[in-house]
Amino acid sequence: MKSLTYFVVILLIFSSITAIGIDKNAGTTEQSPKKEITVFRTFLQPKIYEKDSFFELHVEGMNNNIFIPGQPMLPVHTETIVLPFGVKIIDIECEVQNIESIILSQKIYPAPQRIIIGKSISSDIPLMDETVYNSNKFFPDNWFDFYVGVGLDDNNKHASLLTINTYPFRYNPMSNTVKYVKNINLKIDYYDPSINIFPETSTYDLVIIAPPEFTGDLQRLVDHKNNIGIKTVMQTTDEIYSQYSGVDKPEMIKYFIKDSLENWGVKYVLLVGGLNNLIWANPREDRNYGARDWRIPVRYSNLLDSEPGYVSDLYYADIYKESGEFDNWDSNDDGIFAYHKGFSLKNDELDLYPDVSLGRLPCRNNNEVKSVVDKIIHYENNADPSWFNKMIVVSGDGFLDQENLDFEWDTNGLPTGQYTIFAQSINPEGISGPIDETIVTLDKTQDTKLTFNHDDYLIVPNFPQYPASPVAKIMSVSNGDILGKDDYLYKPGEGEAYCNSYYGYANVEYRDEILHIRGKTYDPKPYGYTTNISVWIKNSEGVIVFEDQRNHSLMYYEGEWATGEQMLHERAGALYYMPEDFTSEILWTSNGKWTGQSDVINSMNEGSGFVFFSGHGSPRTWGDQYPGIPGNRRIGSVTGLANVALSSPFFPMNKLTNDYKNPIVIVGGCHNSMFNITLLTTLLDQRGTKSTWCYGIPTPEGWSEWLTRLPKIGAIATIGNTGLGFGVLGEWCTVGGVDGWITTEFFNQYGTEGYEILGEVHKQCITNYIDTFGKRDSSDIQTVQGWILFGDPSLMIGGYDTN
């Protein structure tokens, strides 16, 4: 997010004027004169491309798209204007010039769905939002929209953040008409705040909040920070509770943090404490918070679209909302914090921009405190590029984004007999894979018998060794099946064909004597995203009775694009953004370098500055899938790293030997950073009804907290999701928001934008995410709320160079 320079432009011809008025009296004083900014934008005519019987609009100079799932994916220009902290926007006037229109012959392509990572996909996922596509109104409703937040600018200064989305293209789905403008002029009127509530110089940079029982072991960290020039103070929870009031203990702590910003000029807040027991502890008093069994209490989000709440430490960092007011995360004062469910009028309006860089060390006892303090001090005092300047990435194929091939073989008029269906795929390099053969009987006197199969792993030579030649597999009919006298339809569920509910690529269908031949085609190698597949059918005499092909069939291995170094739709994977002096070790399922935990552990044992896992997770394990997910997830999955296992070694993380060569770990997936579990709460949740996400496997601590608190070994810090993670299938996996966007943004902020302090990188990722995607979809809200930093927010990445 960069500050912009603006100039006033006088327009001579206006075609349309729109103004949004706001309460002009609220938050203003006679000492705050009205100010004005005018922004002028010029847009080029769109280029139209056909895609899957839809149209896509591409326009040079646009930096975003509408990514609200199922709604028309129109180009957007998004910009964030940095204004003084606490400004009051009066109104924004939009003037447009030169409106033109074009009529399309096909619908605009819908924005991709956000899929819960690792969870079965609902069969009612709408590919198109019918409320929009069946409407006779232009979408979006206006040529622009905006939202105002309060957070930190590029220089870590408190500011108001005005994000404006301009929509030069608006679409009427009923008439299939696109209106577009060449010029948009925005005039913004606002009042400056009358006073600055923050000190010019900081008394303290870092405040550590901890229970009294941890202060003795934390004093070493306080002394260390002060010695290296990070002015640090420690405050106990008991002291805070005795001095502050609030509806509960989390709010008392939040008020203390607010005072720390306004009185001391604090930049970083470190919370030290998790649950108080590994065996059993009560994770929450009610739907809003947990305190009694917590060293440091937690706030739960009540975003209920996907799960019954999750811990959000963003609550402690998001202090202010528009006009600089305190944001208590209960905007409608109904006593339910951070409530969100669908499009309910009861949803709380949240700012979500962090106003301070905040992290947590979720220690449960003094031994864990000693371990993490020891690692932090050693890390910052012993910078060593020989092991730090290396990045490890681990990933595979996140989703089975197979297109619906749907070859239609019309058997009308064909004689009874045996027929052999052949399929073969070829990649752009001209390499052909093995031929898949399926023998069926055509006999209209018999009952139809069709069976689904998913055994493409049998086609891959030496499975699971990769890379391999292209794969073609017919799934909707099997050897020995009978095409008979009656119709047949079967839709395999997620347990048989992952993501089939979304694509329908595996549906078994025989109707009106037409067999719909469906299956998979993919190229199992790094970045092998396109293949051509040919299908032909011979009768018992070897005569071809049917042949067809599908060209440029796409399948993306989402996690590999997120972690890799190539560009996709003008956004690259993590390695692309890293400094040139960094080396990389790429552990992908498609390159054959990741086949199990030993590959990951051996690589981490050598030490590295960063490890990026992008895939599927839970509180006890992380993994992903082989390319194409052969045999579906049960066969096609591979474990990357677990804290608890059912066979030896029972605690795989403990096998790490990377003493004091501790990486910053970014993990993409569900619940890896969930830290409100214990051994008994997970053991007793056999069916998952208590949402511990371990399904009866006793897990005393979550994946990220375990990796972070290990003595000497493991991570120096971990960033991941406390709740469900979301992903985007296929080609928009790095651009379309949620997990694939925010995780790669970390490396953009560190490697390209140059942020060196851990908490500032984390804070900037959340800020940029909200700038780019806003807060309209619940998956966007959950992405930023649940993305927690386990580590010291004031940590100098790589340590301090003593020279």
Task: List PLM regions with ranges.
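Extracellular and select intracellular beta-sandwich modules with Ser/Thr-enriched
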Residues: 432-438, 446, 529-531
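Cysteine-dependent hydrolase recognition
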Residues: 24-403, 430-431, 436, 443, ...
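Short, solvent-exposed loop/turn segments at the edges of extracellular beta-sandwich modules
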Residues: 426-431, 524
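Surface-exposed, short loops/turns at beta-strand junctions within beta-sandwich domains
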Residues: 412-417
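Structural beta-strand segments of beta-rich domains
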Residues: 511-517
